[in-house]
Amino acid sequence: MAKVDTTERLAELRKLMKERNVDIYMVPSEDSHQSEYIAPCDARRGSAGYAVITHDKAALATDGRYFNQAEKQLDGNWELLKQGIQDVPTIQDWTADQVEGGKVVAVDPSVVTAADARKLADKIKKKGGEYKAVDDNLVDKIWSDRPSRPHEKVIVQPIEFSGKSFEDKIEDLRKELEKKKSLGFVVSMLDEIAWLFNLRGSDIPYNPVFFSYAVVTPTTVTLYVDDHKLPEEVKKHLGDKVTIRPYNAIFEELTTLSKEAFTKDKADATSKFLTSSRASWALNKALGGEDRVEETRSPVGDAKAVKNEVELEGMRQCHLRDGAALSEYFAWLEDQLINKKAELDEVDGADKLEAIRKKHDKFMGLSFDTISSTGANAAVIHYKPEKGECAVIDAKAIYLCDSGAQYRDGTTDTTRTVHFTEPTEMEKKAYTLVLKGNMALERVKFPKGTTGFALDSLARQFLWAEGLDYRHGTGHGVGSFLNVHEGPIGIGTRVQYSEVSLAVGNVVSDEPGYYEDGKFGIRIENMIMVKEVETSHKFGDKPYLGFEHVTMTPHCRNLVDMSLLGEDEKQFINDYHKEVYEKTSGYFEDDALTLKWLKRETAPY
């Protein structure tokens, strides 16, 4: 990963800032829909974080997943703010500290949430500065070769995979609106729109979504999407129940809708429009601001996170195919490195894995860039290998592969860490501690109402006992042929994970890890589904919940330190490996190499 020279870009941006009377400009990584993954046309900065530019300084704030990468890629123009580290200011505090003397801070209002804008405006005002919206994005103005906005076709996600009609989903949403006496809900998150209407797209790499907004009122449904993206099949699917309007018409029409709703003879003093708490400042302004808008956790997002039985079965089935693909890949890679002494780089590995996945039924693409990382690169949590710059896979070093795919019946995300020769004692110890944490989380039983925040330490406990830890969450929600990272649930120390309890039908990842910069990295990730479980008692007359694993890929026996495992843990691994073999070996009737590898890796301890 080479350093990126940003001197010329910063000079151009600062020139434009002076022309617009802007002293400080803020550049979030999200798009107008607060998407985590973005289209190339919205890639105004890197993977995750926040950039702030003044006339003589530039700062980048990011979290622990990207510290290593940022240090390698940032040039001397930038100050790196490692968020979450003691005594390091938040990007908001750093920005507020720059406004002395009445400086003007500006942002594109479409790429920040209304809630974040209010908080920062208040902070800046207290410091004597001004926070304002600049409707045209200044980075876009200097981006001479900015890619055009994608216009890919939308497809229908049929009920055989969705398990519920979009009409029924709309009616469920209207019941929520009725409870709140709301005038309507503006849906701005792309995965929520795709799920709500049983549609999928391909406007953002790896995410089967399409650029759109939707407005659902007690009597109308409007989908804001460019008409040329909708084939006849989609129009027939939507029928006359949904009005189609151009994507760019949303702001003007929201303003009109709000004005009409709040005329003196119509308005109920207590009624407001609902938006997601992640809706943009621009949307909030179009609706008339706080007096006319209630921001809430999205009822669509909440419903989407609870998979129905059809979606859950789809997740089970796609993980069988995906597990078979991963076993074939690891068997092939070991054979290439050990027996054939082949020289393969990290991209070669990622490309081979994608080719194997493509052979499987219902494959639609990858769910994110494959993290194919050898040795020290495995310590870069969100490493992305680049051809010509990446490392050759070293058979004598740890190899970490974090990968996933999109299938019509589900989304996968699996991490396995392997070693093809002789790992060090520390590598084996760290791997086994991570594996113990992975199992502890999967095996827990907990009362209904428990949050992912409360469960996080289960996965870290064995690392903590040795004074070790990892700088990322333990689990994230996963969509059904949708985004691989899905809210509102998760397992980790983020505040939002304490706000929503886990429920039957949730699908989350279980992915503790351990990383030593410059040496190696370890992560083990399974997908687990929340289910109701039997217990001897039911304290407080509450149902108790647990997890069902759906990932079907063996753990690396070469990295396990058996002396650190209890008998119950050994039995748990043996039972899991028996299940993996029974459910996936049938894929290898004509593949002796993979079948031999699978038998060895799933043999009892």
Swiss-Prot record:
UniProt cross-references to Gene3D superfamilies, sorted A to Z: Creatinase/methionine aminopeptidase superfamily, Creatinase/prolidase N-terminal domain
Keywords carried by this UniProt record: Aminopeptidase, Hydrolase, Manganese, Metal-binding, Metalloprotease, Protease
EC code(s) of this entry: 3.4.11.9
Cofactor detail note: Binds 2 manganese ions per subunit.
GO cellular component, one term: cytoplasm
Binding site for Mn(2+) 1: 413, 511, 525
Cofactor needs: Mn(2+)
Residues annotated to bind Mn(2+) 2: 402, 413, 525
Superkingdom classification of source: Eukaryota
Cited SUPFAM superfamilies: Creatinase/aminopeptidase (SSF55920), Creatinase/prolidase N-terminal domain (SSF53092)
Catalytic activities: Release of any N-terminal amino acid, including proline, that is linked to proline, even from a dipeptide or tripeptide
EC category: hydrolase
BP GO annotations: proteolysis
InterPro entries per the UniProt record, alphabetical: Creatin/AminoP/Spt16_N (IPR029149), Creatinase/aminopeptidase-like (IPR036005), Creatinase_N (IPR000587), Pept_M24 (IPR000994), Pept_M24B (IPR033740), Peptidase_M24_C (IPR032416), Peptidase_M24B_aminopep-P_CS (IPR001131), X-Pro_aminopeptidase_P (IPR050422)
GO molecular function: metal ion binding; metalloaminopeptidase activity
Task performed by this protein: Catalyzes the removal of a penultimate prolyl residue from the N-termini of peptides.
Family of this protein: Belongs to the peptidase M24B family.
Name of the protein: Probable Xaa-Pro aminopeptidase P
Species name: Leptosphaeria maculans (strain JN3 / isolate v23.1.3 / race Av1-4-5-6-7-8) (Blackleg fungus)
Encoding gene, per UniProt annotation: AMPP
